[in-house]
């Protein structure tokens, strides 16, 4: 494990072991986007393992356009005080000062998120400089390993946020899983070439090839709107689920939230899945990913 970049003697930076351990505690759970303390309480009551505090869910960000930034500190603190479960908040890609502010507010995790407008199109945040663990998105294994090398303690497959269309989430999860399986079949000398192709450090590539999994927790996100969506992503190898617009843009948020939590737990039991899928009211209308122009796709942000 690489702890060379994470000295903790000063007390100001957390070790990789501690940060990754905090993310591990969320495994098997659902993390829900919330915009008010009331929504946060609904999410907690439904069984969410954490909430993501933000001013606009991805569907609204997509619809309204403009520059999307870190949420107001008052709003984040209101949600922190409303619930007992961990609270995450989003910072723009590369915006290390937004991350510094979020850490000072006492959030439990920071999501360096492509849902917000990137602040830097060259650099991501140096996440080793922070005590708080970071979550980052990835569409493939190379992207995931680059974020881990920068200090990310959890990876989420990106999907396409704010659409209610799960197709990109499945594409990204399958890509990460397929590339890991390919690494496992390579010889030691072939891993050098693979590291170059993935644009990732050789040591991390070897660690993944030997373990058959990422060295951090892997969640899924982007377009999950039904219990069946959540269960499918778990069956594809996700260790937990982020749900954004899919809950509070639906007809009965409390019931849908509880159903998605149950589906994530019992993801391989079709009888339970059939039961929790009944009578949920209308799902979010959503957008077909194929109808979104390439420059408008949030998953393309990040490098």
Swiss-Prot record:
It is an enzyme of class 4 (lyase). Its EC number is 4.3.3.6. The active site is at 90 (schiff-base intermediate with d-ribose 5-phosphate). D-ribose 5-phosphate binds at residues 33, 162, 223, 244-245. Pathway: Cofactor biosynthesis; pyridoxal 5'-phosphate biosynthesis. InterPro entries: Aldolase_TIM, PdxS/SNZ, PdxS/SNZ_N, RibuloseP-bd_barrel. GO terms for molecular function: pyridoxal 5'-phosphate synthase (glutamine hydrolysing) activity. One of its GO terms (biological process) is pyridoxal phosphate biosynthetic process. Pfam families: SOR_SNZ (PF01680). D-glyceraldehyde 3-phosphate binds at residue 174. The keyword Lipid metabolism does not apply. In the presence of PdxT, forms a dodecamer of heterodimers. PANTHER family: PYRIDOXAL 5'-PHOSPHATE SYNTHASE SUBUNIT SNZ1-RELATED. Belongs to the PdxS/SNZ family. HAMAP family: PdxS. This is Pyridoxal 5'-phosphate synthase subunit PdxS. The lineage of its organism: Bacteria, Bacillati, Actinomycetota, Actinomycetes, Mycobacteriales. The gene is pdxS.
